[in-house]
């Protein structure tokens, strides 16, 4: 029967809509949708298709699940369809967590659950894209100066606010951005415990997090001065904002000064404050 078939194919809540409807069998493409659901669930502690329509159902039986997850799947944050928004008091996790994350992550979820539903062959977010976005999210973390909880750097929100990083999502204290470094298209927040890896500074070593190449460190005699320590085996070349050039040998540091440019081999990183 239908329930038996679904039980063999997977759990409806985490299956691609075309599999729930019975139009397709599990495949690489349907697995990509399931991966997106799992990542959304992990970060939002909520299901991307469970909103007002799910809340209106009294008994979540097989026909109801087939409707929500298969025949009429609507993303709870679809920018063009508000018919399935999260319901306060029922879907509070989705409402709380969605606003915490930066726009680039929200955008990829929107793509995964709009185009990824309407165009399964071309709209799904691939695993390699998720890897890049998860690293980008990790690099965007910075800490609230009041409660020390993690917040996220969002360049879009920063531009829209005229450079104001806003308030901490947890304690509502005013946030202060730490120094950051731009390497190519990537931006990494330079917190007290930040480390840069080969992935960040060498395009030939994507996803290489085997050992750090740089680490934020405090000046040994002046705790108010922070720097980036070379913990690799290679020499760096630093150009200050004033134009002076110096070498930074392994185990030496460069101050986190506005406009300083660090040449890590072929890659160049610029310090922003």
Locate predicted features.
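C-terminal boundary/linker segments immediately following FHA domains
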Residues: 239-273
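Asparagine-centered strand-capping/turn motif at beta-strand->loop junctions
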Residues: 228-232
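Conserved C-lobe activation region of Hanks-type protein kinase-like domains
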Residues: 27-33, 39-106
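Short Cys/His-rich micro-motifs in 6-15 aa windows
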Residues: 168-180
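N-terminal beta-hairpin/loop module of FHA
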Residues: 177-221
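Terminal C-lobe "cap" of eukaryotic-type protein kinase domains
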Residues: 108-141
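Conserved activation segment of eukaryotic-like protein kinases, specifically the C-terminal portion
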Residues: 4-23
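Short cysteine-rich clusters marking metal-coordination/redox-active sites
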Residues: 144-147, 165-171
């Amino acid at each position: 029967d239908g329930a038996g078939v679904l039980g063999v194919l997977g759990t409806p809540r985490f299956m691609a809509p075309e599999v729930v409807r019975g139009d397709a069998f599990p495949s690489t493409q349907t697995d990509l949708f399931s991966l997106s659901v799992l990542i959304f669930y992990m970060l939002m502690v909520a299901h991307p298709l469970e909103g007002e329509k799910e809340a209106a159902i009294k008994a979540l039986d097989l026909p109801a699940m087939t409707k929500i997850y298969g025949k009429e799947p609507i993303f709870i944050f679809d920018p063009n369809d508000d018919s399935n928004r999260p319901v306060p008091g029922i879907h509070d996790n989705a409402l709380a967590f969605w606003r915490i994350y930066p726009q680039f992550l929200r955008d990829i979820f929107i793509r995964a659950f709009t185009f990824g539903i309407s165009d399964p062959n071309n709209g799904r977010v691939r695993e390699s894209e998720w890897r890049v976005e998860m690293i980008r999210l990790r690099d965007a973390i910075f800490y609230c100066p009041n409660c020390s909880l993690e917040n996220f750097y969002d360049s879009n929100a920063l531009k829209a606010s005229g450079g104001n990083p806003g308030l901490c999502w947890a304690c509502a204290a005013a946030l202060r951005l730490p120094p950051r470094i731009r390497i190519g298209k990537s931006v990494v927040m330079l917190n007290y415990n930040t480390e840069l890896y080969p992935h960040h500074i060498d395009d030939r070593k994507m996803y290489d997090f085997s050992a750090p190449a740089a680490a934020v460190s405090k000046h040994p005699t002046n705790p108010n001065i922070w720097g980036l320590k070379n913990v690799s085996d290679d020499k760096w070349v630093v150009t200050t904002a004033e134009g002076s050039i110096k070498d930074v040998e392994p185990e030496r540091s460069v101050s986190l000064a506005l406009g300083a440019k660090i040449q890590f081999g072929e890659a160049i990183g610029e310090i922003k404050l």
